[in-house]
Protein backbone atom coordinates (compact mmCIF):
# COMPACT_ATOMS: atom_id res chain seq x y z
CA UNK A 1 0.00 0.00 0.00
CA UNK A 2 1.45 3.38 -0.95
CA UNK A 3 2.00 6.31 1.41
CA UNK A 4 -1.04 8.30 0.26
CA UNK A 5 -3.37 5.32 0.68
CA UNK A 6 -2.10 4.58 4.19
CA UNK A 7 -2.60 8.20 5.23
CA UNK A 8 -6.03 8.29 3.60
CA UNK A 9 -7.13 5.11 5.37
CA UNK A 10 -5.96 6.45 8.74
CA UNK A 11 -7.79 9.74 8.21
CA UNK A 12 -11.02 7.93 7.30
CA UNK A 13 -10.76 5.60 10.29
CA UNK A 14 -9.93 8.34 12.79
CA UNK A 15 -11.65 11.49 11.58
CA UNK A 16 -14.50 10.71 9.18
CA UNK A 17 -17.72 9.73 10.85
CA UNK A 18 -19.89 9.60 7.74
CA UNK A 19 -17.40 9.86 4.88
CA UNK A 20 -15.67 7.15 2.92
CA UNK A 21 -13.06 9.24 1.13
CA UNK A 22 -11.15 12.51 0.92
CA UNK A 23 -9.72 14.05 -2.22
CA UNK A 24 -5.93 14.55 -2.23
CA UNK A 25 -6.19 18.36 -2.18
CA UNK A 26 -9.21 18.78 0.08
CA UNK A 27 -8.34 21.17 2.92
CA UNK A 28 -8.81 19.10 6.06
CA UNK A 29 -8.07 22.01 8.40
CA UNK A 30 -10.38 24.65 6.95
CA UNK A 31 -13.22 22.12 6.73
CA UNK A 32 -12.82 21.23 10.40
CA UNK A 33 -12.04 17.58 9.67
CA UNK A 34 -8.84 17.76 11.68
CA UNK A 35 -7.88 20.21 14.43
CA UNK A 36 -4.74 20.77 16.51
CA UNK A 37 -5.36 17.68 18.65
CA UNK A 38 -6.06 15.71 15.50
CA UNK A 39 -2.73 16.82 14.09
CA UNK A 40 -1.03 15.39 17.17
CA UNK A 41 -2.83 12.06 16.65
CA UNK A 42 -1.86 12.15 12.98
CA UNK A 43 1.78 12.92 13.81
CA UNK A 44 1.91 9.97 16.20
CA UNK A 45 0.56 7.71 13.45
CA UNK A 46 3.03 9.07 10.88
CA UNK A 47 6.00 8.64 13.21
CA UNK A 48 5.07 5.06 14.02
CA UNK A 49 3.98 3.94 10.55
CA UNK A 50 6.71 5.61 8.50
CA UNK A 51 9.52 5.65 11.07
CA UNK A 52 9.99 9.41 10.94
CA UNK A 53 10.70 12.01 13.60
CA UNK A 54 8.93 15.35 13.73
CA UNK A 55 10.03 18.53 15.45
CA UNK A 56 8.04 21.43 16.84
CA UNK A 57 8.99 23.38 13.72
CA UNK A 58 7.26 20.73 11.59
CA UNK A 59 3.91 21.31 13.29
CA UNK A 60 2.61 23.95 10.89
CA UNK A 61 -0.58 23.92 8.81
CA UNK A 62 1.42 23.85 5.59
CA UNK A 63 2.47 20.28 6.38
CA UNK A 64 -0.97 18.93 7.33
CA UNK A 65 -3.73 20.80 5.48
CA UNK A 66 -4.30 18.23 2.71
CA UNK A 67 -3.50 14.58 2.07
CA UNK A 68 -1.04 15.68 -0.61
CA UNK A 69 0.76 17.97 1.84
CA UNK A 70 0.87 15.21 4.46
CA UNK A 71 2.30 12.74 1.93
CA UNK A 72 4.89 15.28 0.78
CA UNK A 73 5.86 15.92 4.39
CA UNK A 74 6.32 12.19 5.04
CA UNK A 75 8.36 11.69 1.88
CA UNK A 76 10.57 14.67 2.74
CA UNK A 77 11.16 13.32 6.26
CA UNK A 78 11.90 9.82 4.97
CA UNK A 79 14.44 11.23 2.54
CA UNK A 80 16.15 13.34 5.19
Residue ranges and their predicted role:
Residues 40:
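Conserved catalytic core of two-component sensor histidine kinases
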Residues 6, 27, 69:
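Residue-level recognition of oxygen-bearing side chains
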Residues 14-33, 52-60, 78:
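Phosphopantetheine carrier-protein modules
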Residues 1-20, 72-80:
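Thiotemplate assembly-line natural product biosynthesis machinery
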Residues 58-69:
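AMP-binding/adenylate-forming catalytic domain of the ANL superfamily
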Amino acid sequence: MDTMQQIHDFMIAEFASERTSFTPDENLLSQGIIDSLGILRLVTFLEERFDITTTDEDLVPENFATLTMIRNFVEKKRGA
